[in-house]
C-alpha cells in the first residue's frame, strides 16, 4: 500500500485504505459481511500448511478476500508434475521453494496482506512456535503423519483446524477442534497402514481445486462466525465430494469429541513439552509407525541397464509389468505383459527367469515376494527404480508421469 494513500477510519476505529474499499467493495455489499466483516477478515491471521493442490486455491481466495496475515509453510520445491493442479506455480518457477513461489504470486494479487513463509516441513519441533502465531490453521497436506501432527498441535494450542483432502475424483472437508468439536484423531483414532497418494493413484486438478476453494470458504465463515459456524452453536459436519457422481456433494454430521481420544479427551496423553522433546516417542504413543517396505536382497534386483541387455539377448524370460492397466496404457516396454499387483496371486505356474517391473521399483518388490511364495521353483527378480530408472539410465525419451 502506498504510504501516502489516504486512510479512512471506520466507525469502530479500525482502518481501511481507499484501495481496500475499492478492492473489497463487491463482497462488502453482502449483508453477511459489510464493513464489520471486512474488518474481521483484516484482523485475522491464517496459516496454510502445504502450498500444493489444496493450498494454492485456498491461499488465493483468502488473500483476495483480504485476510490480514497469511503464513505459508512448505519445505518442497515446484516440480513440473505439480503444475496441472497447483495453479499458483508456473513453468518458470520449477525448482523454486513453493512457499516463495506462492508469496510472489499472492503479493502481486493483493499487496495489502502480510505474507510470512516457512521453508520447512511440519515437525513436532517446529510446529508449535509457528501455529501459535495464527488464529486459524488450514491443513493442505497429503501426508497421514503430518495430519495427525497438525491436529494434535492445534488441539494443544486451541486453534481451529480446517482440513481437506482429495484423491482421484473425490474430496472431503471438515472443521476440527472448534467449539469443543472433535479433532482429527477423534474421527480417525488409528492410522491406516497403507495410504494412497496423488503420486500413486492420481488426481484431477479441478477436484483438488474445488476442495481447496471450499477450505477458503469455510475459513471465511469461521472467521465471521456465520452460516452455522457460530460459537457455541457449532454442529460438527463433514463435506464429501465426488466429481463424477450425482449429486456431487454430501453433507454428513459427524460424531462429537471422543472421551477416549489421546489428543483431546479427558485423559489425553499428549503435551507440548512431550511432543517437542520426544518426537520418536510421540509417533509410538500415537500408534503411528511409518510402513517401510523391506528391500529385496540385491540378488533379486537388477538395474535398468541389465534389463536392456535381457530384452536384447534373452527372449525366453517372462516379463511382467505389475502396474494398473491405466498406467500400462500410458507407456510400456516391449515384451512386458500387464498383470496388476492385485492379480499376481493367479500366477502359480511360473518357471525359469521372471522379470518384474513397475513405475518406480516399489510395487514390483511386493510382487516379487508374492510370486516367490507361489513359485519357489522360478527365479524371480525386479528392476531397481522401475520405469523411472529406464528413463534415467537407458532411454531419456521414455515418458515419465
Curated annotation (Swiss-Prot):
Protein localization: Cytoplasm, Cytosol
Enzyme Commission number(s) of this protein: 2.7.7.-, 2.8.1.-
Keyword annotations of the record: ATP-binding, Cytoplasm, Metal-binding, Multifunctional enzyme, Nucleotide-binding, Nucleotidyltransferase, Transferase, tRNA processing, Ubl conjugation pathway, Zinc
GO cellular component, one term: cytosol
Gene Ontology MF term list: AMPylase activity; ATP binding; ATP hydrolysis activity; metal ion binding; nucleotidyltransferase activity; thiosulfate-cyanide sulfurtransferase activity; URM1 activating enzyme activity
Keyword Nucleotidyltransferase annotated: yes
Entry-linked SUPFAM superfamilies: Activating enzymes of the ubiquitin-like proteins
Family: In the N-terminal section; belongs to the HesA/MoeB/ThiF family. UBA4 subfamily.
Designated name of the protein: Adenylyltransferase and sulfurtransferase uba4
Organism of origin: Schizosaccharomyces pombe (strain 972 / ATCC 24843)
